[in-house]
């Protein structure tokens, strides 16, 4: 069921659509609402909201859990190719695109008169170019790699919605990684895990399977309120005809001025010296090496410097392990948490439900997410001591013996 959230403010000027991952819609909506978005509507893998141009700039620069932000510019019904062409021709693309600018078209169609999405894009391209030729006696050029504006076309049946992409390159590309681990967690998803976990930057955070340290880096940026796009060079809206550079500089300066201190530490470790070396280089360039402490270490040897602490890990999913090895691996993770992280909270994301049956701990919460195409669950575990710990341990022993041989 869709949820609508309202803020009583001055009437907003423009509707926007923020695209995100399944399961992150609520935290993306919270981020946008805190920035001043109004009429926030949670959709499937997206959030609709209203705001002015300053909010559009700020959302692109600061939102951690958004992949891209679209500005709808037209919607219409059609029953033929000719009608589709005429409706696209009417759209005032010149408000956003210079006559000598560049553009590209992306189409998604379902149950449509079009045989394929490429034909819809081609027809829309012709309509746009013909409009410019009629108005200016010239036409913009197609650039599929680095266009000034990227036009998104959504066709369902006889309905068409058209939007332009204000983000340019996907917002998960923060600009802080010089090298990327082949299986690195998406930055937007990593930030989403941090926000979903409920960590308030009021204690240490630990990722003892950090790989390229995406979770520690995103946690550190959140902890000091560093804008998610702090290291990006540009955004799509900067190439629009109505781009306001002074407004952008104001938005950027105001956001940068909110960067604060973090009195705790974020620890990341991994058994791969190569991953840690690359992560250290990125973190040093970001000037976060006073916050993020990295080490080459097996997870069995990790102990928190102080408790309580928060743990967020993305363990191996077991593609290259047999079932017995994987079950023992997950059992060992659970044992480390029980023995070394009393009074702490741990979160684990994995698609492997069978392996989690051997974890030896009962989750207090589960959140369904996707990591790329993999359907995952984000499990919350709370570690206790004393009578409550003993009670849980007894239950966990029965739980483990039932599922693990």
Segments the model singles out, each with a brief description of its role:
Residues 5-147, 400-405:
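Non-catalytic nucleic-acid substrate-recognition regions in nucleic-acid-modifying enzymes
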Residues 20, 270, 350:
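Short beta-strand/turn micro-motifs composed of small residues
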Residues 58, 63, 169-174, 178, ...:
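Flexible, glycine-/basic-rich loop-and-beta segments that form/coincide
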Residues 108, 154-196:
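Class I S-adenosyl-L-methionine
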Residues 110-113, 169-170, 316-320:
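A short, flexible beta-alpha/helix-coil linker loop
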Residues 185-304, 319, 327:
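Conserved S-adenosyl-L-methionine
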Residues 298-403:
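C-terminal catalytic and target-recognition region of SAM-dependent MTase-like enzymes
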């Amino acid at each position: 069921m869709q949820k609508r959230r309202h803020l009583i403010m001055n009437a907003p000027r423009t509707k926007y659509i923020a695209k995100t991952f399944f399961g992150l819609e609520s935290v993306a909506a919270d981020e946008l609402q805190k920035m001043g978005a109004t009429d926030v509507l949670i959709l499937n893998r997206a959030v609709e909201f209203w705001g002015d141009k300053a909010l559009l700039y700020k959302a692109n620069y600061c939102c951690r859990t958004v992949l891209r932000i679209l500005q709808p510019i037209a919607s219409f019904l059609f029953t033929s190719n000719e009608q589709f062409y005429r409706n696209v021709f009417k759209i005032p693309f010149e408000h956003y695109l210079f006559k000598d600018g560049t553009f590209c078209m992306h189409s998604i169609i379902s149950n449509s008169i079009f045989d394929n999405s490429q034909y819809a894009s081609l027809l829309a391209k012709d309509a746009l170019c013909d409009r410019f030729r009629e108005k200016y006696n010239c036409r913009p050029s197609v650039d599929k790699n680095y266009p000034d504006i990227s036009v998104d076309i959504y066709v369902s049946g006889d309905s068409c919605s058209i939007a332009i992409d204000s983000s340019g390159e996907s917002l998960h590309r923060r600009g802080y990684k010089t090298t990327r681990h082949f299986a690195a967690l998406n930055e937007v998803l990593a930030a989403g895990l941090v926000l979903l976990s409920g960590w308030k930057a009021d204690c240490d955070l630990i990722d003892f399977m950090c790989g390229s340290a995406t979770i520690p880096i995103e946690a550190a940026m959140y902890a000091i309120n560093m804008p998610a796009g702090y290291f990006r060079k540009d955004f799509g809206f900067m190439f629009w005809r109505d781009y306001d550079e002074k407004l952008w500089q104001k938005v950027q300066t105001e956001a940068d001025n909110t960067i604060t201190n973090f009195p705790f530490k974020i620890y990341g470790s991994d058994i791969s010296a190569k991953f840690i070396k690359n992560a250290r280089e990125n973190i040093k360039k970001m000037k976060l090496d006073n916050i993020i402490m990295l080490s080459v270490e097996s997870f069995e040897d990790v102990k928190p410097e102080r408790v309580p602490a928060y743990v967020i890990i993305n363990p191996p999913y077991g593609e290259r392990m047999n079932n017995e090895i994987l079950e023992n691996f997950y059992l060992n993770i659970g044992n480390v948490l029980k023995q070394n992280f009393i009074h702490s909270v741990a979160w684990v994301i994995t698609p492997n439900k069978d392996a989690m049956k051997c974890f030896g701990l009962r989750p207090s919460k589960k959140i369904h997410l996707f990591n790329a195409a993999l359907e995952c669950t984000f499990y919350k575990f709370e570690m206790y001591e004393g009578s409550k710990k003993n009670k849980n341990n007894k239950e966990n022993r029965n739980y483990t013996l039932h599922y693990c041989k």
